[in-house]
Amino acid sequence: MNSLTTSAFDLPDHLAPKADPALIARDVQHFAAIAESLEQSIAELSDRLDAERKSPGGIGRQAMDRDLEIHRLTARLRALRRFGLDLCLGHMVSADDPEPVYVGRLGLTDSTGRRLLLDWRSPAAEPFFGATHGNPMGLASRRRYRWTRGRISDYWDEVFTSDGFEGHAAALDDQSAFIASLGGNRSPRMRDVLGTIQADQDAIIRAGSRGALVVDGGPGTGKTVVALHRSAYLLYSDPRLGHRRGGVLFVGPHQPYLAYVADVLPSLGEEGVQTCTLRDLVAEGGGAAVETDPEVARLKSSAELVKAIEPAVRFYENPPTKGMTVTTHFSDIWLSPEDWAEAFDAAEPGTPHNEARDQIWEELLTILLDKHDDDEASPDLLRKSLLRNRELLKTFNRAWPLIEAADLVGDLWTVPAYLRKCAPWLSTDEIRLLQRADAQAWTVSDLPLLDAARLRLGDPEAARRKRRHKADLAAEREKMNKVVDALIESDHDGEGLVTMLRGEDIQNSLVEETTAPGTEPDQLAGPFAHIVVDEAQELTDAEWQMLLLRCPSRSFTIVGDRAQARHGFTESWQERLERVGLDRINLASLSINYRTPEEIMAAAEPVIRAALPDANVPTSIRSNDIPVVHGSVSELHSILDTWLAANADGIACVIGDPTFETTSRVRSLTPELSKGLEFDLVVLIDPEKFGEGIEGAVDRYVAMTRATQQLVILTSS
């Protein structure tokens, strides 16, 4: 359990204004009460659990009741020990009651019955997840915490009332800070703009989870934060999305982005959201290189090529066309081609190739046992003899082998005839182009095919684990039968609860719990009830298949900006998504940029319009009178030193200089890795070297619009 003896707050030096007692004194007091209640509850539960374990076991119903109580106490104790003060997600303040209501992963009261934490799943907690500036649901403000190793390392306040900003300035989140900056002198135009922002965001957050919702918006429109709030709200409001129904998967473009997501989306423990990049979905993703040949990348980006995986697997699922004599210790049995075909048909539809082997093998043994007409041999002895028949095993393994996904996909790139058979629509030149010397020199473009192959094949170790598991179960049942025999012998009437242990269902449930296979499930394999995809304009048709395979319900929140697509995006969202396999598509647009100053957007807009004349560039409504600065690369360090000295808070980013090393307050990124992130100061190094055509223009546009305060462009010439 996390420590409860220290202050809940551990704010870094640059967030010193947030440590003002006027902002956090009430929290400190409340967290002290939570800590005291947690320690008391844990001590009481531990004592009760010890007492139950030491109490006489009893017999019959008494024994069962005792076991149930031990199970209940253990579960509650485990839940409380799993977290410390970070049980608390945040608090909300009602417009008509200044007393904060703290929302937690679990409900918690003190010894007097005073509520310390409101369970996040209760109806009373809905405003914490559902309130927006357009529909505050009766809230005056909401505070979210960022927990790091059990202590608060940052927090943000959202203020929903026009007179509630006083005293919150140091802790306001971006949108609340923007609204506060407008002050009381809002023009009619600004009031209209603000109303548009609030109404659009509210509609997106509250839109139902059925089908695909596209949130289209340019830089600074708040689309990512809106999507994150939507995730939290859907998880709260839609019971179909709980983790026992599949849960929510949030897919981001890269790891720096996922770190940002962790700051915004509240962690909801077991009911939470899985976050990942596309690379994380495939074991080979971490080491995969970028495909250097654009034509190879284009061919592999097609969803059509992913379909080649099915015939590639079926190639290894052909029953023998010749019969064979199977020799046993008792007699010879003829196994005909028709018998092989019947066994192969026994695989249940949808069963992965490697996992279907057991079904086919069992059917094959059944056919052979049925054809044996010698009554002298028992089925068990005959079965053991068949299992030792090397020729039978060899023929079966050749007809339906265990296959690794990496071997299957690697063969496509090194055996031209195999690729031609599986993808007959490819031309001879295209087949030749896709061949390579190293079968498993994986690139990012290979990942969708590896993913599809792994799903279609299943785990090659699954059959082995399953056989070991069955052997363990048999041994456990045999041991349990001996125990039951002893219990019945000691039971006076031989009836009641003890004899119930003879029941197969009860034995199965008890044995399954004690001998479950020791494998960690793939948390990203799905299926998921809902998937959120950010920077979705970058996904290829093949990459979309990776996500569709994980979401049978086709329930998506799709966040993106066509103008930021590095490889171009000339069609509409509707056309793109229908082509990859989605239907029931709704589009929501965010057109107002309330974060990026007009001065920066004025410089960035011509850059993207030169390559994409119809780019959807958002309207920037904020000016800070700081012009875009141009200079020489030699000025980089002096510019950063001057900015750091003048700004105690904030983060800067240098984009385009791989030799610059990241520091505590200055990041160093490529244009591609800066996507989706924001910084107070952005310094571009030789942006003209970012590339040519649409890709270069998009990289320059994205890099320029990462700045929320100041943009500096430095060149070598």
Identify the meaning behind each predicted range.
Residues 250-251, 386, 443, 590, ...:
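Active-site-adjacent beta-strand anchor residues
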Residues 1-194, 199-202:
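Extended, charged low-complexity regulatory segments
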Residues 2-45, 52, 167, 173, ...:
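P-loop NTPase Walker
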Residues 197, 453, 536:
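Conserved hydrophobic/aromatic pocket- or pore-lining residues that grip, position, or stack substrates
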Residues 336-530, 539-544:
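Conserved helicase NTPase catalytic core signature
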Residues 240-241, 246, 255-300, 456-457, ...:
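Conserved helicase motor core of SF1/SF2 NTP-dependent helicases
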Residues 208-211, 217, 239, 243-249, ...:
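Conserved ATP-dependent motor core of P-loop NTPases, especially the RecA-like helicase ATPase domain
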Residues 92, 309, 453, 600, ...:
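A residue-level signal for conserved active-site and pocket-lining positions in enzyme catalytic cores
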